[in-house]
Amino acid sequence: MPKILDAIIKASKINKKLLAVLIDPEKFATENYSYFIEKLPEAVTHIFVGGSTATTAQSEVCVDFIKTKTNLPVILFPGDKEQITEKADGILLLSLISGRNPEYLIEQHIKAVPKLLNAGLEIIPTGYLLLDGGNQSAVARVSKTKPIQQDEIELIRNTALAGAMLGKQLVYLEAGSGALIPVSEKVIAEVKRDLNIPLIVGGGIRNATQLKKAYKAGADLVVIGTAFENGEFK
């Protein structure tokens, strides 16, 4: 039974909004994150762990520690197959459908199979779209792909719907870590209008007002990383 995905789908159907905090294993240090995790807002429903260039060891240490501090589901958000660890509860198996680099469309997934076969992780196929957040993101740099401009709404919408038609279970609109501009309400609303699977939105959300706008536009789950890490979220 896919417990994590099932819970997200059920929440989406009743318009219950979800919130994930994203932790980058490369920035992780137990002495700093112990207090951080214990003081997470009650609204947080999931913890995502991942970064663009983290190692397996870094991911394992990070996930291990987090699971001693919280009962929230810990989900891998990997930038590379090396970040996969069986210590987590699940994994967003990301396909970067906004780009055309085969390495991040299918090749990383093939390389990950030996690890995933026996990891016992709940695997959630996810269509991942990188949108322009006003600065160069680590995702764009590492994947060697260009983000879609946020005014290309039809392209964004059709790419997301194509992902759903291909069988992805979630669609993730990403403005990039530390984005100057979050995913716009117009983009979220247009994508959500015909999407029959849950929608995740992340990147550049720094305050409760932006969070509420993303929810109102149609985001089912919002991901906040940099703003929580730096204590900037208000």
Swiss-Prot record:
Q: Please name the InterPro entries in this protein's record.
A: GGGP/HepGP_synthase_I (IPR039074), GGGP/HepGP_synthase_sf (IPR038597), GGGP_HepGP_synthase (IPR008205), GGGP_synth (IPR010946)
Give the required cofactors: Mg(2+)
**EC numbers:** 2.5.1.41
Q: What class of enzyme is it?
A: transferase
Give me the Gene Ontology terms describing cellular component. Answer: cytoplasm
Which Pfam families does the record match to this protein?
A: PcrB
* MF terms (GO), sorted A to Z: magnesium ion binding; phosphoglycerol geranylgeranyltransferase activity
Catalyzed reaction equations: sn-glycerol 1-phosphate + (2E,6E,10E)-geranylgeranyl diphosphate = sn-3-O-(geranylgeranyl)glycerol 1-phosphate + diphosphate
Keyword Magnesium listed? yes
Q: Where does the chain bind Mg(2+)?
A: 24, 52
Q: Which UniProt keywords apply?
A: Lipid biosynthesis, Lipid metabolism, Magnesium, Metal-binding, Phospholipid biosynthesis, Phospholipid metabolism, Transferase
- The organism sits in which domain of life? Bacteria
Q: What does this protein do?
A: Prenyltransferase that catalyzes the transfer of the geranylgeranyl moiety of geranylgeranyl diphosphate (GGPP) to the C3 hydroxyl of sn-glycerol-1-phosphate (G1P).
SUBUNIT field:
Homodimer.
Q: Would you tell me the protein name for this molecule?
A: Geranylgeranylglyceryl phosphate synthase
Annotated source species:
Zunongwangia profunda (strain DSM 18752 / CCTCC AB 206139 / SM-A87)
